[in-house]
Amino acid sequence: MLIRRMTKWDYDAVDRLLLQLQQADARSRPDMFAPMAHYMPRESFDCLLENDNVVAFVAQERLDIVACCFVSLLDSSSAHPVKIAYIDLLVVDAAHRRRGIGRRMFAEVGRYARRAGAGKVELTVYSHNKIAESAYSAYGMAPQRSIYEMTL
């Protein structure tokens, strides 16, 4: 398996992966996520790849893209300033899970974050995504905060 930087030629494969996540979210929380044909328009994808504060990776097995990840470099707004590598999205193809691909992708993010001068890696995961919560805990991450809601 090869982990490499994402290119504009990866759009169709990445869109397929992102739709897997979006469809799972829509099944779990239809009040928050509506079904859609594409996770993001091609133009938005291209803009992300051109953004100097965003890095995107794919995991490739033979000719197949089996995982993708978007990471933004942010400056902390806390009293203790630190650069943060924020994982916007990390998706492993459902047919390829439980094979260490997510762990390898996460390790690549860590290497990139250290080289970029980040002091920590952060991400947000919805509480209905127990698979992701379990994976991130196994990678050494710990919960930072919770957001609560009440439907009126």
Language model features by range: what are they?
Residues M1, L63-C68, A85:
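Glycine-rich phosphate/pyrophosphate-binding loop shared by adenosine-nucleotide-utilizing enzymes
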Residues V58, D64-L73, V91:
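Conserved beta-strand in the GNAT
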Residues Q22-S44:
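Conserved GNAT-fold acetyl-CoA-binding loop/helix
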Residues L2-R16:
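A short beta-loop-alpha structural element at the N-terminal edge
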Residues E43-V58, Y86:
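A short helix-loop-beta-strand connector motif used in the catalytic cores of GNAT acetyltransferases and
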Residues A113-T124:
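Conserved GNAT acetyl-CoA-binding A-motif
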Residues L89-V92, R98-R111, A138:
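Conserved acetyl-CoA-binding loop-helix of GNAT-fold acetyltransferases
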Residues R103, R115, S127-R145, M150:
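Conserved active-site alpha-helix within GNAT-family acetyltransferase domains
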